[in-house]
Amino acid sequence: MNEIERRRTFAIISHPDAGKTTLTEKFLLFGGQIQVAGAVKNNKIRKTATSDWMDIEKQRGISVSTSVMEFDYLPAGQEGEPYKVNILDTPGHQDFCEDTYRTLTAVDSAIIVVDSAKGVEAQTRKLMEVCRMRNTPVIIFINKMDREGRDPFDVLDELEEELKIKVRPLSWPIGQGARFKGVYNIYEHQLNLFTPNKQRVTEKVEVDIQSSELDERVGEREAAQLREELELVDGVYPKFEEETYRSAEVAPVFFGSALNNFGVQELLDCFVHIAPSPRPTQADERLVKPEEPKFSGFIFKITANIDPNHRSCIAFCKICSGKFVRNQPYYH
């Protein structure tokens, strides 16, 4: 895997309070960048979230500016060079949506977070429209499954109707609310069992969906319901193909709870496998390919005087080709 192929640059987007920043924290935890994940709950910060670093974000429990974070990640059991993951945690509130729209010009894919109880909301529709205009592939994470919410099939129907994209579940919840026991990873055929408030996965086992072991681990009633629902999933939704995802025709769907770490690691593992590496960028005159040796890029965000101790300006640049060299002049 060369330097281009191993890069994954994506934005996490959603309507306010769906759980973007909490999901970002869990990704950073699995990436080894932090030891304890912060979270935003009821607009209060439970341990300051890494990406919500501004004073106003800490005080109000919301993201007002896009934060950019990076870590190396290699899924368990995989050998070789790790993927270089760049996360852009975006604001959800409409007052700061221009920041999010600019950020979406600089990413190769996006993860949309949806509240399982509220479903598709106003800002989710607007952000999906931007992704569709730019032909940006999206993965959808149905969050807060540990709370009482809507039937998963109803949520999937709403996703297709409101976001105007075909969906394909790659994980499936076992129970919901107080009965939520974890998720079945359809993509890797694994049963993932969790304990609330744990920072790591409690147990992950490969189990045949028809085996008696499934009944022993989740209970006969839950196992029977899971088998029935997975049969419906296979009958209703198309077989997943990576190319249809990368061409933005189909959105893979995962279920879980970012706050309690349900379903997060399998989302991250699948994402680094299927998400696109840097793609060619359409310039005014031609298509710029990432493997071209000459440096080119564009500024998608500028911040000034954020830290009162440092009166400075920071420009965030999306590299389209070549390699950026410090202290070298570049021209518009």
Predicted features along the sequence, with ranges:
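Structural and coupling elements of P-loop NTPases
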Residues: M1-H332
